[in-house]
Amino acid sequence: MDGVTVIDHPLVQHKLTIMRRKETSTGSFRRLLREISTLLCYEVTRDLELTMETIETPLQTIESPILEGKKLVFASILRAGNGLLEGMLDLVPSARVSHIGVYRDHETLQPVEYYFKAPEDVAERLIIVVDPMLATGNSSIAAIDKLKERGAHNIRFLCLLAAPEGIRNFRAAHPDVPVFTAAIDSHLNEKGYIVPGLGDAGDRMYGTK
């Protein structure tokens, strides 16, 4: 699928299978989400640009590669996005963080925005937007709309699961934003849930209904 990368690393797929199981506990689900987010972050950042820096090791002075440019921004779509955020910050602790409050109205399936906080200079940074589920795509589309209104243009979207319907909607709205996911599932049901999916990621992560 054009513009979509499926991260099929064996460890990612193994952990995802355990997360899908309905008997997986809240604590285990949360831990696995943190672990899998680190692996996903590794893949979504593999082409970051490097520059050479002169450093001193205990033995000699050398030229060594280091990330070039301003720090990344991880933009979490609340609340479930925070589950991915933690593992990514373990890997890139210097990243800046944006929080975007968008929830899906369960009657209309449309996004409702309630919060937005991001660094002022998002136009100068790579933004990685995170949300475990790309279902209808409406929430992620709305979140990226807000970032673009602030001048952001170098954006990537990272999720755990995606539905074909959500991918189509997302790519139609933001064809310039690549999507990274661990799996593309079959379809959405009448309630807008990904099938076979893993249920509501936020509820499973926080033990709510």
From Swiss-Prot:
Domain of life: Bacteria
Binding residues for 5-phospho-alpha-D-ribose 1-diphosphate: R79, R104, D131, P132, M133, L134, A135, T136, G137, N138, S139, D200
Disulfide-bonded cysteines: none
Reaction catalysed by this enzyme: UMP + diphosphate = 5-phospho-alpha-D-ribose 1-diphosphate + uracil
Top class in the EC scheme: transferase
Regulation: Allosterically activated by GTP.
EC number annotated for this UniProt entry: 2.4.2.9
Binding site for uracil: I194, G199, D200, A201
Comment on bound cofactor: Binds 1 Mg(2+) ion per subunit. The magnesium is bound as Mg-PRPP.
Entry's Gene Ontology molecular function annotations: GTP binding; magnesium ion binding; uracil phosphoribosyltransferase activity
Alphabetical list of CDD domains matching this protein: PRTases_typeI
Cofactor dependency: Mg(2+)
GO terms for biological process, alphabetical: UMP salvage; uracil salvage
Pathway(s) the chain acts in: Pyrimidine metabolism; UMP biosynthesis via salvage pathway; UMP from uracil: step 1/1
Family: Belongs to the UPRTase family.
PANTHER family listed in its UniProt record: ADENINE PHOSPHORIBOSYLTRANSFERASE (PTHR32315), URACIL PHOSPHORIBOSYLTRANSFERASE, CHLOROPLASTIC (PTHR32315:SF4)
Function recorded in the entry: Catalyzes the conversion of uracil and 5-phospho-alpha-D-ribose 1-diphosphate (PRPP) to UMP and diphosphate.
Protein name: Uracil phosphoribosyltransferase
Native source organism of the sequence: Rhizobium etli (strain CIAT 652)
Gene coding for it: upp
